[in-house]
């Protein structure tokens, strides 16, 4: 047992001071040569008032371990931290605490920064960013102005998702299961003037370029499904007796002969005007009732509701009259907000037609045979066309591809590609966000704030609580709202909505590398040298929010020449969540939060870092158990004692020590590269136990093996690794050592254990030379089971290094 005990407090204090004086992550090597960069980034946090718990630590530790590993491989590491401080999370906390968001956000950042420093991550705080800093949001506003000038930012009034608790509009991506993803309140609809970003213009590129990315397939599929590309046709249905037509989008234009009615979303622009005197009251009531429901409520598999408008359209393929209905299962923001209904071949349409006694005409049949008295829709995608005029007898699978072009040739529609992705609702009726840099002029219309006048600063207010009226609190500040038009000088008014919390986070990763530049978002020189991000780490919950928006922003900035790449993150890793007991998410309200502060005090940062990884596979959720950190702490003490007991002994490396050293390097390296980090920690434990056994026999372990252990430990437990490295006589930092390499030949066993079988059943296990020939192996095997060889030997089998099998009769 070492005479000097492992003292984590003294060791961690010592090395943090040394790293402060002599940073280990430098851009140039000893010869003055610039190192190749590696940009590893963890998603920056909301500065929550509750501070960090052990669940938050997991992602930070994973990110730092990977960064330090790359540092040991000779890279200059860009590893940064900042604050996603605008938006609903920060503002809702401020309202709850009764403190202005500017004050509460600054206090929260100070506390979380203190906690993050306890992790001892390799952060370059000179690169720190904060989305609420005017020097940062100047460029968030600059991007918006550029998008406006390119026609990607536009105003529109339409029914949006409305959170009655947060009192603001929400993008579709912010609604989960019909609830606000931030506060959990039921989402309703509200007609409001909104700023939109035309992300749909990039839909094809966002979809196709997923193939470029080294991302989890799960995330790529989530984005592909969200973008939702489909092929079909837009078909024009003339409204009977009116000089108007209703356009529908369908992926099955081959079923047009079976369209016996139409359904419009209650928000459709023609919905009210299609009503007649008899139906008007019912139609207007239905439109109002639908406006009070969320999209999720409307799409649920429950009994369909609807109202007949009193008007008819003409099916353009056969001239048949089809009644026009309204139903809330059709959404205004998908397709055209109107659908043609083919009840014989769609479950929802069949249910609706059956309920309201609408004709059902089968147009696709298996083997061309019509079903008598249909009791359910025939939804097989293939079959023979029937009741379809000149299309009868054709295979539906062939006609499905041809029909869009036939419809186009006849002048009744167009072949179309459609996307489920909708334009991004970009404005929020809240105070704590980036002001949208637009001036509303009665003469000139919407005019952007001149770029040289950015940032347009968020004014100080006394009343920052949301109004709930659809107006932002900024609307009440007359001296800020009233201004002159930048274009003509006339009296004008500023835009009073603010940007969503995603505005800054959609591009922040670019700013880290040039955060003091007041002339450009990022200089082209810095961008070419340090971007894009090589490894991005964060939760999968951002798959169709932040990750999609960041890809959109990057493609736009590529298009206008700011950067020379169009994807922000080469590689993505999604870590799982650490939960309390029984898999319950940690939260202050549930009383199951585990603070890292006490654990760092009692066990040390290194122990907590390693346990964060050991708790389970990093991509899966894991349940926290305080007892586990005790085991990791004992492991570090055993490593400490092994080194301290051997460091002054003159031990020559034996073949067994060399083999164990190379096996350790192999196991740690291959598991780390595969990101199965929990098994890296178990590899350390297994090999350390083996080294302890060898040390007992040999009186210690050689310095090269112990030094290798220190280097391998350095990304995981940097303080103790530095201390052990120094104790072993090295004068420079362990992070200048370089990552060790393994030799597969050195790992080979001299002796191997091989089972000996008779007719496939093991009768003995023998040790033979790893290089034994077939004859030598069989001779040793037969000798071991000589007393059991009582019959005629039919066959002798040796699978090298695996098994010996004697077949007897």
Regions found by a protein language model. Give the residues of each.
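Basic, alpha-helical terminal appendages of large translation-related enzymes
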Residues: 1-22, 27-37, 265-268, 277-280, ...
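Residue patterns forming the tRNA-binding/recognition surfaces of aminoacyl-tRNA synthetases
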Residues: 5, 14, 18-22, 96-246, ...
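Conserved oxyanion/phosphate-binding beta-strand-loop segments in alpha/beta enzyme cores
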Residues: 1-41, 71-80, 104-111, 215, ...
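Alpha-helical recognition segments enriched in aromatics with Gly/Pro capping
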Residues: 311-317, 321-334, 363, 481-618
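Helix-rich, typically C-terminal accessory recognition domains appended to large enzymatic cores
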Residues: 149-161, 415-444, 501, 566, ...
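N-terminal catalytic cores of NTP/NDP-binding nucleotidyl/phosphoryl-transfer enzymes
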Residues: 30-99, 105, 128-143, 166, ...
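Catalytic alpha/beta core of large soluble enzyme barrels
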Residues: 63, 76, 268-367, 372, ...
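Amphipathic alpha-helical
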Residues: 200, 205-229, 265-307, 452-484, ...
């Amino acid at each position: 047992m070492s005479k000097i005990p492992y003292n984590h407090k003294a060791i961690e204090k010592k090395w943090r001071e040394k790293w402060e004086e002599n940073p280990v992550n430098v851009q140039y090597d000893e010869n003055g040569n610039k190192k190749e960069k590696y940009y590893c980034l963890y998603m920056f946090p909301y500065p929550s008032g509750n501070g960090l718990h052990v669940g938050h630590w997991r992602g930070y530790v994973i990110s730092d371990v990977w960064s330090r590993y790359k540092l040991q491989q000779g890279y200059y590491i860009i590893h940064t931290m900042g604050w996603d401080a605008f938006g609903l999370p920060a503002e809702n906390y401020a309202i709850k605490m009764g403190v202005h968001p500017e004050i509460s956000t600054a206090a929260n950042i100070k506390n979380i920064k203190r906690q993050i420093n306890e992790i001892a991550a390799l952060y370059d705080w000179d690169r720190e960013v904060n989305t609420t800093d005017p020097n940062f949001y100047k460029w968030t506003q600059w991007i918006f102005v550029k998008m406006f000038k390119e026609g990607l930012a536009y105003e529109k009034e339409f029914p949006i998702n409305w959170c009655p608790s947060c009192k603001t509009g929400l993008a579709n991506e912010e609604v989960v299961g019909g609830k606000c993803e931030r506060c959990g309140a039921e989402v309703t609809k509200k007609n409001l003037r909104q700023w939109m970003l035309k992300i749909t213009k990039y839909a094809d590129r966002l979809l196709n370029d997923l193939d470029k990315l080294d991302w989890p397939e799960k995330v790529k599929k989530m984005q592909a499904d969200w973008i939702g590309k489909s092929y079909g046709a837009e078909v024009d249905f003339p409204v009977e007796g009116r000089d108007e037509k209703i356009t529908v989008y369908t992926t099955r234009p081959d079923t047009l002969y079976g369209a016996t009615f139409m359904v419009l979303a209650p928000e459709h622009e023609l919905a009210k005007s299609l009503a007649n005197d008899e139906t008007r009251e019912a139609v207007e009531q239905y439109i109002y009732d639908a406006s009070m429901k969320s999209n999720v409520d409307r799409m649920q598999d429950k009994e369909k509701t609807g109202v007949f408008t009193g008007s008819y359209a003409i099916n353009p393929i056969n001239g048949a009259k089809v009644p026009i209905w309204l139903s809330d299962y059709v959404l205004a923001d998908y397709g055209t907000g109107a659908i043609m209904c083919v009840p014989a071949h769609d479950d929802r349409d069949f249910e609706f037609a059956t309920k309201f006694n609408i004709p059902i005409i089968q147009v696709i049949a298996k083997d061309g045979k019509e079903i008598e008295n249909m009791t359910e829709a025939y939804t097989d995608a293939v079959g023979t066309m029937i009741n379809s005029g000149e299309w009868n007898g054709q295979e539906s699978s062939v006609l499905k591809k041809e029909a869009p072009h036939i419809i186009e040739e006849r002048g009744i529609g167009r072949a179309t590609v459609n996307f489920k992705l909708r334009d991004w609702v970009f404005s929020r009726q809240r105070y704590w966000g980036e002001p949208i840099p637009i001036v509303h002029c009665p003469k000139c219309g919407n005019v952007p704030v001149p770029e040289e006048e950015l940032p347009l600063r968020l004014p100080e207010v006394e009343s920052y609580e949301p109004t709930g009226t659809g107006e932002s609190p900024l609307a009440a500040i007359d001296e800020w709202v009233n201004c002159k038009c930048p274009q003509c000088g006339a009296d004008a008014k500023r835009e009073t909505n603010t940007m969503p919390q995603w505005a800054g986070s959609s591009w922040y990763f670019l700013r880290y590398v040039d955060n003091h530049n007041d002339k450009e978002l990022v200089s082209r020189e810095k961008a070419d040298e340090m971007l894009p991000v090589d490894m991005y780490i964060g939760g999968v919950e951002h798959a169709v929010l932040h990750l999609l928006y960041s890809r959109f922003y990057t493609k736009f900035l590529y298009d206008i020449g700011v950067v020379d790449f169009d994807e922000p993150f080469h590689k993505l890793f999604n870590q799982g969540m650490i939960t309390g007991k029984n898999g319950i998410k940690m939260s202050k309200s549930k009383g199951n939060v585990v603070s890292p502060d006490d654990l760092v005090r009692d066990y040390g940062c290194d122990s907590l870092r390693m346990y964060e990884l050991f708790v389970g596979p990093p991509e899966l959720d894991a349940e926290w158990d305080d007892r586990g950190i005790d085991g990791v702490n004992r492991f570090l003490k055993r490593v400490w004692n092994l080194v301290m007991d051997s460091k002054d002994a003159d031990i020559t490396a034996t073949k067994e020590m060399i083999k164990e050293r190379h096996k350790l390097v192999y196991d740690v390296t291959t598991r780390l590269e595969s990101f199965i980090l929990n098994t890296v920690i178990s590899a350390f434990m297994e090999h350390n136990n083996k080294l302890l056994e060898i040390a007992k026999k040999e009186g210690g372990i050689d310095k090269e093996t112990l030094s290798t252990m220190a280097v391998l430990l350095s990304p995981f437990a940097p303080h103790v690794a530095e201390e052990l490295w120094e104790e072993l006589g090295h004068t420079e930092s362990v992070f200048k050592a370089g990552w060790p390499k393994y030799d597969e030949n050195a790992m080979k066993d001299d002796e191997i254990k091989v089972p000996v079988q008779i007719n496939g059943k093991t009768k003995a296990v023998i040790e033979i030379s790893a290089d034994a020939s077939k004859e030598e192996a069989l001779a040793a095997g037969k000798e071991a089971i000589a007393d059991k060889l009582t019959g005629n030997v039919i066959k002798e089998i040796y699978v090298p290094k695996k098994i010996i099998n004697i077949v007897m009769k």
